[in-house]
Amino acid sequence: MGNTLGLAPMGTLPRRSHRREEPLPNPGSFDELHRLCKDVFPAQMEGVKLVVNKVLSSHFQVAHTVHMSALGLPGYHLHTAYAGDWQLSPTEVFPTVVGDMDSSGSLNAQVLLLLAERLRAKAVFQTQQAKFLTWQFDGEYRGDDYTATLTLGNPDLIGESVIMVAHFLQSITHRLVLGGELVYHRRPGEEGAILTLAGKYSAVHWVATLNVGSGGAHASYYHKANEQVQVGVEFEANTRLQDTTFSFGYHLTLPQADMVFRGLVDSNWCVGAVLEKKMRPLPVTLALGAFLNHWRNRFHCGFSITVG
């Protein structure tokens, strides 16, 4: 009796498993490439500032700001914000209308609209008393793995002047984003364009970003050491002004003390720091800042109180 070769039925043969790759994420907006690094650095403070925030409803809130400084006259700002019902993310609500008016009548206004699921529009207006200074219109389309933006700044058909800015970002991998910016300006007797290439690499605990073009270069590095410590390094070079700046920022969070400390040191011999303290259970935040420029022998300090 011959040997019998037992074959498994075709239905029981092992099949090769194909791992389904995750789709590439949207790279976000071009203006937010250096956002993580910039948030590490402290905002310069000078004088005394009082800010009172008031939430009138789930859609509308106002803020009153009084600023007194030795460098100028005291000023008052009224800030209003309206947020609609369409919330795409914790930080994105449509439509959104934001306005800020000072005691002299100057106005800064911004309107954000969601025209379609992937198409967004923004309008920015800035006036100085009764004169228009800036009017800007943006259109942004966010695909699955890319973002395209077109901006028109101060369009004037009569004066034949306009500023056009085009942005494009593409996710190459889950960590690498590449893109560019094209700035075109036109006015009587002058016309030109500037091209800038951009790239961002995101790791688990750090992000490196680079913008380079004929107008200069901008590089930043953000590193999150742990939940309390974040650092940022920034390099900026401007070919038109023949100026180069190197900055180091430090961000320290003390959750048990409800305190946040931000500090910076740059190549212009400037040292600065801002300390924020939340006075719980009161809805009050105190901030104290000081900045010293050794090269120009200038010292600025500020104190602010935020209620609400």
Swiss-Prot record:
| Keyword set, alphabetical order | Ion transport, Membrane, Mitochondrion, Mitochondrion outer membrane, Porin, Protein transport, Transmembrane, Transmembrane beta strand, Transport
Location relative to the cell: Mitochondrion outer membrane
Q: What does this protein do?
A: Potential channel-forming protein implicated in import of protein precursors into mitochondria.
> Family, per the entry?
Belongs to the Tom40 family.
Q: Record's Gene Ontology CC terms? A: mitochondrial outer membrane; mitochondrion; pore complex
Q: How does it assemble?
A: Forms part of the preprotein translocase of the outer mitochondrial membrane (TOM complex) containing TOMM22, TOMM40, TOMM40L and TOMM70. Interacts with mitochondrial targeting sequences.
Major location category of this protein: mitochondrion
**GO biological process terms on file:** monoatomic ion transport; protein import into mitochondrial matrix
Which gene holds the coding sequence for this protein?
A: Tomm40l
Q: Which GO terms describe its molecular function?
A: porin activity; protein transmembrane transporter activity
For the region Disordered, give the residue spans. 1-29
The protein, known as:
Mitochondrial import receptor subunit TOM40B
Q: How does it sit in the membrane?
A: Multi-pass membrane protein
- Where are the annotated segments for Required for mitochondrial targeting? 281-308
